[in-house]
């Protein structure tokens, strides 16, 4: 009885994912450049909204994982758009890391380096590498990892700083959001660095990743 229920739930969840959730986000993505930064609870697109690194990186992970699990080319196409967008618009070409948010025209709205967001970028890129073996995406993930280790890791205190300025200087307000505490370290950020580091190790068997 339980086995039949599990099979049924799996079929229902798979249908929900492939027929509703993923198609919704593929339609939202459009050409992969000129898409709205926000869709509200009523499904209305807001093209004037900025595009956040966390949203893009999470979508990149999602479509990369979906392609890896199903082999469906439309998911690979979506993942490719997202990886390209992340590389061209959200990775800081001057200082490394990723911008927290960019405007619709691509200019940084908030250039601070939030460790949480950089971690998600590593997570999305490493999953894309798992799905495709793309060496450029691996280089991008490795560079972000290097930025975290060079600038964010505080060896004296034994943790990763919550946030820094665009050029990796101390930041007075390090909060992830207005409802979060303004703390130097947080469990939330450390959990969301452990996850991408573990995923990166799957595709980049470097000792410095394993020991980080």
Language model features with spans:
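Glycan-recognition and catalytic cores of secretory/periplasmic carbohydrate-active enzymes
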Residues: 1-212
């Amino acid at each position: 009885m339980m086995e039949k229920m599990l099979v049924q739930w799996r079929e229902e969840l798979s249908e929900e994912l492939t027929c509703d959730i993923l198609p919704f986000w593929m339609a939202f993505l459009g050409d992969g450049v000129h898409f709205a930064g926000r869709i509200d609870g009523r499904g209305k697109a807001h093209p004037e909204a900025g595009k956040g690194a966390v949203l893009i990186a999470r979508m990149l992970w999602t479509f990369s994982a979906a392609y890896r699990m199903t082999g469906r080319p439309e998911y690979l196409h979506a993942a490719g758009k997202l990886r390209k967008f992340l590389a061209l618009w959200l990775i800081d070409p001057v200082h490394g890391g990723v911008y927290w948010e960019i405007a619709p025209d691509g200019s940084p709205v908030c250039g601070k380096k939030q460790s949480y967001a950089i971690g998600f970028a590593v997570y999305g890129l490493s999953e894309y590498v798992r799905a495709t073996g793309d060496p450029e995406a691996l280089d991008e993930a490795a560079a972000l990892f290097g930025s975290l280790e060079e600038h964010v890791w505080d060896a004296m205190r034994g943790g990763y700083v919550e946030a820094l300025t665009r050029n990796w200087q101390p930041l007075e307000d390090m909060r992830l959001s207005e409802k979060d505490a303004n703390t130097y370290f947080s469990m939330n950020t450390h959990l969301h660095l452990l996850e991408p580091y573990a995923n990166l190790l799957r595709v980049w068997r470097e000792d410095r990743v394993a020991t980080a």
